[in-house]
């Protein structure tokens, strides 16, 4: 996805969220969640060698219209050893986007979300274009598309039983500078007032 298209998509999402806020009082609630997550990342050249990174995410969502919320997420993941590469990798990302919840009128509430933002990789090896030196860090565009299932324990405390996302980023690597990753996790969710 080129830069102009990314900017267009982000501006479009922000515009739609602003219009939605002005039209109707939301029926969903504020919430904050903390999850433990594992990120399945693709490895350097030389076979799949895919690897898992341990970490976590923190999210805050604010209702904007009916079952839609604006979401902000901060995530961090780390591995001390990339297979066949003799280096570790740490990732920190910050993203924002839109979440939709399906009202089920039961203790179980599924959701889907789309997030856009950036990721910073460090404590690793990032190759450089010809004529430049490689670095131990890089920053790029990031995107996450996924969903999950929340289960009510009480009115304000929920268990995030499952959260699964496809993550895309374009940190420099030896495979065309694209990362296609799977992130799965579970955690706890605190919800505000409301219905």
Spans of features found by a protein language model:
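Cleavable N-terminal export/targeting peptides
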Residues: 1-27, 193-195
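Short glycine/proline- and aromatic-enriched beta-strand/turn motifs that initiate or cap beta-hairpins
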Residues: 22-62, 70, 166, 183-195
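Gram-negative (and chloroplast) outer-membrane scaffold detector with strong preference
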Residues: 23, 59-130, 140, 160, ...
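Short sequence motifs at beta-strands and strand-loop junctions characteristic
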Residues: 26, 50-53, 88-92, 135-142, ...
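Membrane-spanning beta-strand positions in outer-membrane beta-barrel proteins
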Residues: 31, 69, 107-109, 148, ...
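Extracellular loop and loop/strand-boundary signature of outer-membrane beta-barrel proteins
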Residues: 42-46, 81-86, 129-135, 171-176
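Predominantly the C-terminal beta-signal and adjacent terminal strand-loop region
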Residues: 151-195
């Amino acid at each position: 996805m080129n830069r102009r298209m990314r900017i267009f998509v982000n501006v479009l999402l922000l515009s739609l969220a602003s219009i939605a806020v002005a039209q109707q009082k939301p029926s969903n609630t504020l919430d904050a969640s903390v999850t433990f997550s594992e990120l399945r990342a693709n490895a350097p050249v030389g076979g799949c060698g895919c690897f898992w990174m341990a970490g976590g995410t923190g999210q805050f969502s604010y209702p904007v219209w009916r079952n839609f919320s604006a979401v902000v997420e901060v995530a961090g993941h780390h591995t001390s050893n990339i297979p066949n590469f003799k280096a570790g990798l740490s990732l920190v990302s910050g993203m924002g986007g839109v979440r939709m919840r399906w009202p089920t009128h039961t203790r179980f509430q599924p959701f889907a979300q789309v997030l856009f933002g950036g990721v910073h990789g460090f404590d690793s090896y990032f190759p450089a274009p010809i004529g430049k030196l490689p670095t131990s860090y890089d920053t790029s565009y990031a995107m996450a598309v996924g969903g999950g299932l929340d289960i009510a324990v009480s009115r304000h405390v929920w268990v995030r039983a499952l959260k699964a996302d496809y993550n895309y980023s374009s940190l420099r690597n030896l495979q065309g500078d694209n990362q296609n990753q799977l992130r799965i996790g579970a955690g706890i969710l605190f919800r505000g007032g409301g219905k």
